[in-house]
UniProtKB/Swiss-Prot annotation:
Induction: Expression is increased during conidial swelling and germination in presence of human serum. Optimum pH is 3.5. GO terms for cellular component: cytoplasm; intracellular membrane-bounded organelle; membrane. It comes from Aspergillus fumigatus (strain ATCC MYA-4609 / CBS 101355 / FGSC A1100 / Af293). Belongs to the glycosyl hydrolase 33 family. This is Exo-alpha-sialidase. Residues 1-20 form the signal peptide. Sialidase is able to release sialic acid from a wide variety of natural substrates including bovine salivary mucin, colominic acid, bovine fetuin, a serum glycoprotein containing both alpha-2-6 and alpha-2-3-linkages in a ratio of about 3:2, and glycoproteins and glycolipids from thermally denatured human lung epithelial cells. Does not show any trans-sialidase activity since it is able to remove terminal sialic acid residues but is unable to catalyze their transfer to the acceptor substrate. GO terms for biological process: ganglioside catabolic process; oligosaccharide catabolic process.
Length: 406
């Protein structure tokens, strides 16, 4: 009889709408901490490499926790301006130990570089951690004199050419990996021919995170497709799953029902574009009227699968502005509905500009949610030279659930 009651309770929890869930996490003491992790050139103690190379701005964050518990935070280090083209390196920071969970600025190692060879554009970090702790890091790259729309002016006065479908002029997809907890990285391998459709010019992987499925495969979201890793951990072979209607920047999670959930940036301001499926196929993408979005990247995280199962989503919850960052929880088996959540501005970061834009999340070893979020100083009238930094936030479920509007 007791087991039957438990089964009935589990079914009720699964099918109740998000607003009806009495989450036991709400009774815990709310916790939140935050500080700038990637400090732009206009800030006190700006982040530089050990070589002395500094960066005007940092953008496009990604964060993962390895199987040892160490946290790796990635970003684009933009050398001369905040813009999407020109000399951009892929940089990162690690927590000093596997147990400190990045709780304070002193818990992080200094800035390092994954790759920055040449004056080209390295970006869109999209890591995924395998069962054997191999960290696969997918990257996008294009040549120094190319940009997405062309006719942009580099610091030396060179006018960029528009990215095209030639081998020299197209966006390339690279993969690097680490087998020592992110301490060192292999030379990036160009997988464009294998994993990017023929004839494409522009391309983007992630940015954000890949995932490991309960069935063992790895899945990395990319423009118009998923990249699938099959085979033994640390020795994966990669293939492509095309997705009709998918966006240029996608996020992915395996929901509690075992299905895959793509939540993509819309091509225009409005609402997030969502589709559900499996490795065998996806349904159609459709706007989610409950998730407004200003045509920006977002991030999604499966926090846990046991009852009450929780899926976390973070974006700018506005159809017009990137400054409305809000974190939400869904209790639905398919992440159909998210609660109101909590605005990140409830815990503002002093002296770090105007928070909002791209983000990435991971679950820390002490059961917190760790989130990297962009911040823009908007201290230049044209926006071209406005400095960009990246904030690190740690908060628990109770902090979300005890928000003033939840």
């Amino acid at each position: 009889m007791q087991s039957m009651r438990f089964m009935i309770l589990a079914l009720l929890v699964q099918f109740l709408p998000a607003w009806a869930i009495n989450d036991p996490a709400k009774s815990a003491a709310p916790y939140h901490d935050e500080f700038p992790l990637f400090r732009s050139a206009n800030m006190a103690s700006p982040d530089k490499l050990s070589t002395g190379i500094g960066f005007h701005s940092f953008r496009i964050p990604a964060v993962v926790r390895t199987t040892t518990g160490r946290i790796l935070a990635f970003a684009e280090g933009r050398r001369h301006t905040n813009q999407d083209f020109g000399d951009i390196n892929l940089v990162y920071k690690r927590t000093k130990t596997t147990a400190n969970n990045g709780a304070s600025p002193s818990d992080w190692e200094p800035l390092r570089e994954v790759v920055g060879s040449g004056a080209g554009t390295w970006g869109n970090p999209t890591p995924v951690v395998d069962d054997d702790n191999t960290i696969y890091l997918f990257l996008s790259w294009n040549g120094a004199t190319y940009s997405q729309n062309g006719k942009d002016v580099l610091p030396d006065g060179t006018v960029t050419k528009k990215i095209d479908s030639t081998w020299e002029g197209r966006r390339h997809l690279y993969l690097t990996e680490s087998r020592d907890d992110g301490n060192t990285w292999s030379k990036p391998v160009d997988l464009t021919k294998e994993l990017t459709p023929d004839g494409w010019a522009w391309d983007a992987v992630g940015p954000g995170n890949g995932i490991r499925l309960t069935t063992g495969e790895l899945v990395i979201p990319a423009m118009g497709r998923n990249i699938i890793g099959r085979g033994a951990p640390g020795n994966r072979t990669w293939s492509v799953q095309r997705l009709s209607g998918a966006g240029a920047e996608g996020t992915i999670v395996q929901t509690p029902d075992g299905k895959l959930y793509r939540n993509d940036r819309p091509s225009q301001k409005g609402y997030r574009m969502v589709a559900r499926g499996t490795l065998e196929g996806f349904g159609a993408f459709a706007p989610d009227a409950g998730l407004p979005d200003p045509a920006c990247q977002g991030s999604v995280l499966r926090y846990n699968s046991d009852a009450p199962a929780r899926t976390i989503f973070l974006n700018s919850a506005s159809g017009t502005s990137r400054r409305a960052m809000r974190v939400r929880i869904s209790y639905d088996a398919d992440a159909k509905k998210f609660n109101y959540g909590r605005k990140l501005e409830d815990a503002k970061v002093s002296g770090a500009g105007h928070e909002g834009g791209y983000s990435s999340m991971t679950k820390t070893g002490d059961y917190k949610i760790g989130a990297l979020v962009e911040s823009d100083f908007f201290n230049d009238g044209t926006g071209k030279n406005s400095y960009r930094a990246i904030i690190w936030r740690r908060f628990n479920l109770s902090w979300i659930l005890n928000g003033p509007n939840n």
